[in-house]
Amino acid sequence: MGTVNVVNVAKKHQFSWYEKFYFWSIGKGLWITLKHFVKVAFFNKQVTIEYPDKKRQYSTRFRGMHSMKRDEQGRERCTACFCCMWICPANAIHIEAAEVTAERQHLHPEDKYAKKFEINLLRCIFCGLCEEACPKGAIYLDGTGEMAADNREDLFLTKERMMEKTGGPILGQRN
């Protein structure tokens, strides 16, 4: 067997003087800090909002808390088709379906309804895919952004907490 010549192709990168001492990165960070300092100190631009006293203004396109809408007759729009659950990239939605009985027929437009509908806000990334996937327009991400909670159980939204009140405004389309 013959010998094999091995060639080492790895090169060591030679850092320049400012890369060696990280002056460039430190200077960029200090420049950003100095810009914020000048805005706040000399131009009186507030960065922080005093939350309980002042409320933040949200855009009309803001995706906030989840809500479930009713149709024009006050019935639940959700028909437990599982589209929102399947499309959720964070697996934050859990639905259990049930058949509509004769005594509940006035509450649901279809033959199937969501017996249990939960959204785990600890997992939700508020991407809005559930809203886009819903063929009935049952789930919306409305503009309310106050989601502070004292315990983990408050961050699990149930159907009862999300459902629009009977006789409330019917929101059909997002502007």
Swiss-Prot record:
GO molecular function, one term: 4 iron, 4 sulfur cluster binding
Residues that, per the record, bind [4Fe-4S] cluster 2: 88, 124, 127, 130
Biological processes, Gene Ontology terms: aerobic respiration
SUPFAM superfamilies for this protein: 4Fe-4S ferredoxins
Pfam families: Fer4_7
Domain of life (superkingdom): Bacteria
Reactions catalysed, as given in the entry: a quinone + NADH + 5 H(+)(in) = a quinol + NAD(+) + 4 H(+)(out)
Keyword tags: 4Fe-4S, Cell inner membrane, Cell membrane, Iron, Iron-sulfur, Membrane, Metal-binding, NAD, Quinone, Repeat, Translocase, Ubiquinone
Domain 4Fe-4S ferredoxin-type: 69-98, 115-144
Entry's Gene Ontology cellular component terms: plasma membrane
Reported cofactor(s): [4Fe-4S] cluster
Primary localisation category: membrane
Membrane topology, as annotated: Peripheral membrane protein
Cofactor detail note: Binds 2 [4Fe-4S] clusters per subunit.
Protein family (similarity comment): Belongs to the complex I 23 kDa subunit family.
HAMAP family given in the database record: NDH1_NuoI
Its biological purpose: NDH-1 shuttles electrons from NADH, via FMN and iron-sulfur (Fe-S) centers, to quinones in the respiratory chain. The immediate electron acceptor for the enzyme in this species is believed to be ubiquinone. Couples the redox reaction to proton translocation (for every two electrons transferred, four hydrogen ions are translocated across the cytoplasmic membrane), and thus conserves the redox energy in a proton gradient.
Subunit structure: NDH-1 is composed of 14 different subunits. Subunits NuoA, H, J, K, L, M, N constitute the membrane sector of the complex.
Protein's recorded name: NADH-quinone oxidoreductase subunit I
Protein source organism: Leptospira biflexa serovar Patoc (strain Patoc 1 / ATCC 23582 / Paris)
Gene symbol of the encoding locus: nuoI
